[in-house]
Structures are given as structure tokens and as C-alpha cells.
Amino acid sequence: MIELDYLTIAFGGAIGAVLRYLVSRTINSLLPFSYIPLGTIIVNSVGSFFLSFLMFAAIEKVPLSKEAILFFGTGLLGAFTTFSTFTYETLSLIEESPARGVAYALANLLFAFTCAYFGMILGRGKV
């Protein structure tokens, strides 16, 4: 039922968006001296880990229902991670300092892909 799919995604997305706001705001307030927005790096990395873990575990070990994938993958983790904030912050930092902006972009990608890789390994049960 398509309408239920939308509600499932919306409910997961609402939770993910609030969690992202809380985590990112908390990290950035604890580390106000940081030269880059660490909150975004952390939410993107954590979200990448859990999405990879969820999807690889669902494919190879424990089949998940369509509703669980929509709720956790598309909804919660989709809203928890934030590509748009990452790109905005990168451009803002590049305007201030090109080196800092590029370093931020590379750090975000490096940490997110590394966490996604470990999520894949753990999701497949290789550890």
C-alpha cells in the first residue's frame, strides 16, 4: 500500500531529522573552537555506517521487511545524514579559506566512506 509507505518514510524521517539536529548541535556546541563543522561529519559518518550495516545485513544475513527498510533506511537514516548541509558548509568554508573547505570536504567523504565500509563488513558478518 503506497500511502502506508509514505507514512512509514515520513515517521522515520521525522525521527532522523530530530536526531540529526540534536547530535549535530550538541557536537558543535561542545567543540565551538573547531575550524570545521564536526557535527555534520559525525552524523554523515554514523549514518553511513548504520545504513551500510542495515542494507548488507538485510541482503546477506537477516532479511528485513520492506517497511523496515523504508523506515530505517529511507526515513530515519536518510534524514539523519545530510548531503545538502555538507555541500553548503563546504562552499561557505571555501569562501573563507579554500584549503579549509577542501579539507572539510575530503574529511567528510573519507570518514563517511570508511564508516560505510566497516558497516558493510559488520553487516556481512565478516568480523
Curated annotation (Swiss-Prot):
The chain crosses the membrane at residues 4-24, 39-59, 68-88, 102-122. It holds the Pfam family CRCB. Na(+) binds at residues 78, 81. It is a multi-pass membrane protein. GO terms for molecular function: fluoride channel activity; fluoride transmembrane transporter activity; metal ion binding. Na(+) is not transported, but it plays an essential structural role and its presence is essential for fluoride channel function. It is found in: Cell inner membrane. Belongs to the fluoride channel Fluc/FEX (TC 1.A.43) family. Fluoride-specific ion channel. Important for reducing fluoride concentration in the cell, thus reducing its toxicity. HAMAP family: FluC. This is Fluoride-specific ion channel FluC.
